[in-house]
């Protein structure tokens, strides 16, 4: 019976990750197609996606209140949802890698961006925004940053990103993170 519970927990976790991936991909696709949509279509689609994130967040809250064995594994997903809703991170890809706790892929993405900047495929402003997001995500995942990365982060971190990092560190417990994410969803709907 214990092994069946582990299997079910694993399957539930997989399903939740797939749902989060789908929502993050939806946000990413929306940003990529922003120019092709009129303002109303864009805002409506974004609002619907945020509502879906809110519903997903509510589901996570119910799961966490009933099954404490999932708390640690779901905390990363909650922080990712919080970041998406509060728009601390603007890049859905970074949110997805953060939620899946994949620092190696975040570092690979950072190296690709460095290359793209050097060959002129990426504008400096976008590079700076994304690098700050990735470095913040790496720090939140407990990764050691180089002195240069720390300096870059200090010089370029936005107030929103700094607030996300501060709040996510201070809150710690799942209920408080969920409460904040729920508040951010309500604020985004208005």
Curated annotation (Swiss-Prot):
Domain of life: Eukaryota
GO terms, molecular function: beta-catenin binding
Keyword list, A-Z: Coiled coil
Cited Gene3D superfamilies: Beta-catenin-interacting ICAT
Recorded coiled-coil stretches: 2-63
GO biological process: response to ionizing radiation
Name of a matching Pfam family: ICAT
Subunit details: Does not interact with CTNNB1.
Protein family per UniProt: Belongs to the CTNNBIP1 family.
Protein name: Protein LZIC
Organism: Mus musculus
Gene name as annotated: Lzic
């Amino acid at each position: 019976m214990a092994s069946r519970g582990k299997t079910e927990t694993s399957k539930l976790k997989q399903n939740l990750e797939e749902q989060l991936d789908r929502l993050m991909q939806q946000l990413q696709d929306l940003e990529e197609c922003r120019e092709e949509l009129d303002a109303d279509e864009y805002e409506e689609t974004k609002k619907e996606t945020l509502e879906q994130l809110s519903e997903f967040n509510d589901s996570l809250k119910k799961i966490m209140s009933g099954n404490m064995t999932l708390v640690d594994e779901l905390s990363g997903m909650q922080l990712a949802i919080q970041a998406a809703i509060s728009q601390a991170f603007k890049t859905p890809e970074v949110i997805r890698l953060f939620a899946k706790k994949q620092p190696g892929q975040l570092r690979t993405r950072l190296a690709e961006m460095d290359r793209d900047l050097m060959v002129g495929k990426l504008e400096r402003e976008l590079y700076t925004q994304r690098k700050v997001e990735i470095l913040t995500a790496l720090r939140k995942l407990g990764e050691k940053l180089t002195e240069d990365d720390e300096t870059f982060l200090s010089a370029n971190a936005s107030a929103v990103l700094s607030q996300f990092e501060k709040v996510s560190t201070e809150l710690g417990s799942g209920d408080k993170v969920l409460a904040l994410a729920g508040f951010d969803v309500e604020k985004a709907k208005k």
